[in-house]
């Protein structure tokens, strides 16, 4: 690598996101960066834990220009935990099934090249984030049934795509019971039972 790492982007790729779309979109991203002579280091791993460890190691040893995440909301969440403490800019190239974080920010879901041009040529813009139990979130914090279903869906190897969530709902709903919450909002505290509570940071 001829350039210093401070001029280099880390490109974190989840090849399995979006039913395998992540790999192809990752190739589009790296091809575009090559065409613009942008210095970058691709980072991929077999699991989210391995990817997180690799990114943490790289960012602790050197300074980088930022992180470009190619994946869905899970990868965006993972990268946030690394970028925030290091004050690193980051961008998400949508390649997941939901892409809620990208939709919340109004970023383009299809035109990757013009989006990347903005990423590498303009100054980063600050955004609001939420924090819960020392973890950062960008779009929505979900608790209760929603998070249980998401965890179950992520553990399923079949079926692929959005249908996993329908299967996960069918598996979890019969045994799920409401959770008691204590909520403080605008200075008022109250308790209630609910299937889920979601906190939105955006539209």
Feature locations, PLM:
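Short coil/turn segments at secondary-structure boundaries
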Residues: 66-71, 88
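Short, acidic Gly/Pro/Ser/Thr-rich loop/turn segments
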Residues: 17-19, 145-148, 203
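Catalytic core of DAGKc-family lipid kinases
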Residues: 10-12, 36, 43-45, 84-89, ...
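Glycine-rich beta-strand-to-loop/alpha-helix junction loops that act as flexible
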Residues: 15, 70-72, 93-95, 201
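ATP/NTP phosphate-donor binding region
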Residues: 1-67, 77, 81, 188
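Short, active-site-adjacent cap segments at secondary-structure transitions
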Residues: 75-76, 100
């Amino acid at each position: 690598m001829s350039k210093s790492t401070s001029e280099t982007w880390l490109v974190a790729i989840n090849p399995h996101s979006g039913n395998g779309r992540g790999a192809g979109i990752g190739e589009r991203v790296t091809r575009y960066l090559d065409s613009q002579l942008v210095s970058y280091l691709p980072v991929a791993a077999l699991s989210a834990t391995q990817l997180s460890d690799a990114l943490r190691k790289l960012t602790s040893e050197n300074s980088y220009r930022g992180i470009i995440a190619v994946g869905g909301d899970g990868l965006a969440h993972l990268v946030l935990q690394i970028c925030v403490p290091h004050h690193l800019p980051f961008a998400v190239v949508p390649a997941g099934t939901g892409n809620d974080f990208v939709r919340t920010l109004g970023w383009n879901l299809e035109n990757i090249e013009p989006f990347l041009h903005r990423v590498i040529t303009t100054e980063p813009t600050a955004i609001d984030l939420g924090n819960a139990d020392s973890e950062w979130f960008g779009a929505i914090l979900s608790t209760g049934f929603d998070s249980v279903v998401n965890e179950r869906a992520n553990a399923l190897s079949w079926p692929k795509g959005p249908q996993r969530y329908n299967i996960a709902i069918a598996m979890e709903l019969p045994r799920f019971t409401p959770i008691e919450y204590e909520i403080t909002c605008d200075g008022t505290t109250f308790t209630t039972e609910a299937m889920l509570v979601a906190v939105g940071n955006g539209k």
